[in-house]
Amino acid sequence: PLFETIIDYIPAPEGDPDANTQVLISTIDYNEYVGRIGIGKVDNGCLKVNQEAVVVNHHEPDKQKKVRISKLYEFDGLNKVDVAEAKIGSIVAISGIADIHIGDTICPPKAPEASPFQKISEPTISMNFIVNNSPLAGQEGKFVTSRHIRDRLLRELNTDVSLRVEDTDSPDSFKVSGRGELHLSVLIENMRRESYEFAVSKAEVFYKYDENGKKLEPMELAYIDVPDEFTGAVISKLQQRKGELRNMGSIAGGYTRLEFHIPARGLIGYRGEFMTDTKGNGILNTMFDGYEPYKGEIAYRATGSLIAFESGEAVTYGLFSAQERGTLFIGPGAKVYSGMVIGQCSKAEDIELNVCKKKHLTNTRSSSADEALTLVPPKVLSLEQAIDFIDTDELLEVTPESLRIRKKILDPTLRKRAGFKKN
């Protein structure tokens, strides 16, 4: 039924087979052997192997590059099939053009005319990808050095046009910029599955300054579909994050549609709260909406962290005492080290605890009540929840097997001297 519906309702490709060739590149693939592969639809004319052509972009029409089409592929299911030519309406993959980008148009040299294309939004947030230097570094990952991490990030640039990678003052740290936390979390998860081990910092937004030196920040339009009973909670949370309600209306199925204008930093760490507040039934989509004057400070987290004071293995006796101070992220047997965040404090301060502390053995016979220590099950954070949770003075340690939150400065004395404060 779906295939028949597509045939009945989707219009046939429009274009002139006798006109000059026009192929708009809409996505990029990458192959270790042939390099970048541009994928797009033939809008006009016909594209052939060994044909001379020009690559031109709608937003930079003066920059033109002469190329020769070395390979053409069409798609048969998930496989690429070599073809000699591609006609109107064909979705075609083109290899042999080293510096091809989304939005480029392939056309004949005699009549270079670029197809209109919406400019890709610039990155609005960044995170630092850092070589893991914790006491447990190198035990779980296969690729752990700065060279491994750098090569993997640069390879990602071949297919992800919204990503930016920059060097920093430290050779062990790279500034990675993207369109949002979700964008970067997908990259982090992919690297984790490929056996990379590294640490990431809290997401930060890009600020700009106008000609008068006034601070500007990126803004987002947030479109939200939420069940009617959760509307109040969502509006309240977003207004606390400097969001402005632009529009509100009822839609089918007992849902309300909200439109917010909100700073990009106001959405950092919010998706997890949003899913909790709506019990997983809300839908949140965002779109970049330019730069506007800075809206003021935003309080991200009202609670502190529970920090391990001693390195070793967490035991029931130590965890039983610690769980009274907040919500734990680890259970008995977990490896911990000094400066590692083991839970969320119920107060707005950081507390150091010794979860490796065992009960001292004495000659006094213990009662059964002393032996039956009941632990509350730990809260196991997903990658997105961990990225949302970390504060400005913390890092997320990412390995193929574990996610650990830690302080940037592990030594408690040095940490106090540095004077890190909560936002």
Each PLM stretch: what is its role?
Residues P1-N423:
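Structural and coupling elements of P-loop NTPases
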